[in-house]
């Protein structure tokens, strides 16, 4: 059995119990939780829609669509609400038998822990009621990519950006407002892209602003500025969660030819190594063209 008192320690932007011990009713919108469990600190988002259905997202890469009763149980369980109090609230909301709800909630808590720990299949092993993906239209996207700039320190001929490199950029204050608006819309995951987003000197500030909201943040980059370990450290300290680095080939000549920048491969490789040495989740991206397909 799982020791929930030691295990389920959540930091939330919303409190479920007031000073008098009364459990608060779940509110529509986006709720953020961080579960501290040893070295693992899953980022959990619960989005409650206007019809009381919900979206449970774990680390921005696993998404579960919940019916209203499962959504409310998740809200109370993530706030570590005692079963007796949760059952009382659930009985009022859904007009179900309180005793049956009490046992359902206890089972649900355990299922939720197993789900977050990735110890169980959400379809085969768990009793959590979900709805099939694509069976309904979500109220908001799961993720939003933000093109911070169209400037770039590479010159790839295959670049898909339609904007000129000199296209005007938004200020940090304008991006703060956009990031806040995305949170208000219920979008828990944002990725900074470009152009080359690391050319923005205020990138750590933008990451930090999103982190304060509770959003998961990622970065799409050619990795060259990550060759500076102190720059990587500044992004990690700001709260960056993951990075995707474009590497066109293991062959320096092929890579540099594709990005039309001599010496770029060396910096990108250093950037990848520095990212791997950090707490970031790291991915690489490769564009398959006639220049490199035979060496992939």
Language-model features, listed with the residues they occupy:
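Acidic, low-complexity/disordered tracts enriched in E/D and polar residues
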Residues: 2-75
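Conserved alpha-helical substructure of the radical SAM core
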Residues: 93, 107, 125-242
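Conserved strand-turn element in the central/C-terminal portion of the radical SAM core barrel
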Residues: 271-295
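Short, electropositive alpha-helical surface patch
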Residues: 208-210, 247, 293-296
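Short glycine-enriched, charge-decorated loop/helix-capping segments at active-site entrances
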Residues: 62, 163-166, 257-262
């Amino acid at each position: 059995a799982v020791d929930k008192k030691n295990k389920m320690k959540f930091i939330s932007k919303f409190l479920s119990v007031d000073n008098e011990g009364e459990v608060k009713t779940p509110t529509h919108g986006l709720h953020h939780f961080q579960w501290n469990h040893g070295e693992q600190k899953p980022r959990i988002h619960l989005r409650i829609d206007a019809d009381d259905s919900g979206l449970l997202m774990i680390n921005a890469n696993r998404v579960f669509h919940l019916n209203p009763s499962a959504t409310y149980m998740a809200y109370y369980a993530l706030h570590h609400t005692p079963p007796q109090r949760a059952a009382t609230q659930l009985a009022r909301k859904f007009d179900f038998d309180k005793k049956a709800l009490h046992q359902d909630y206890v089972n649900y808590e355990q299922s939720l822990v197993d789900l977050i720990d990735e110890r169980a299949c959400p379809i085969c092993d768990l009793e959590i009621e979900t709805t099939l993906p694509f069976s309904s239209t979500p109220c908001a996207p799961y993720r939003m990519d933000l093109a911070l700039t169209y400037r770039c320190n590479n010159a790839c001929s295959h670049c898909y950006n339609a904007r000129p490199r000199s296209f005007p950029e938004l200020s940090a204050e304008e991006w703060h407002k956009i990031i806040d608006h995305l949170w208000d819309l219920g979008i828990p995951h944002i990725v900074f892209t470009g152009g080359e987003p690391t050319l923005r000197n205020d990138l750590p500030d933008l990451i930090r602003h999103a982190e304060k909201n509770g959003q998961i943040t990622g970065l799409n980059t050619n990795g060259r500025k990550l060759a500076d370990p102190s720059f990587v450290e500044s992004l990690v300290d700001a709260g960056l969660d993951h990075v995707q680095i474009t590497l066109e080939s293991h062959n320096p000549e092929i890579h540099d030819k594709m990005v039309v920048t001599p010496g770029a491969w060396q910096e990108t490789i250093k950037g990848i190594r520095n990212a791997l040495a950090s707490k970031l989740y790291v991915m690489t991206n490769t564009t398959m063209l006639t220049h490199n397909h035979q060496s992939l």
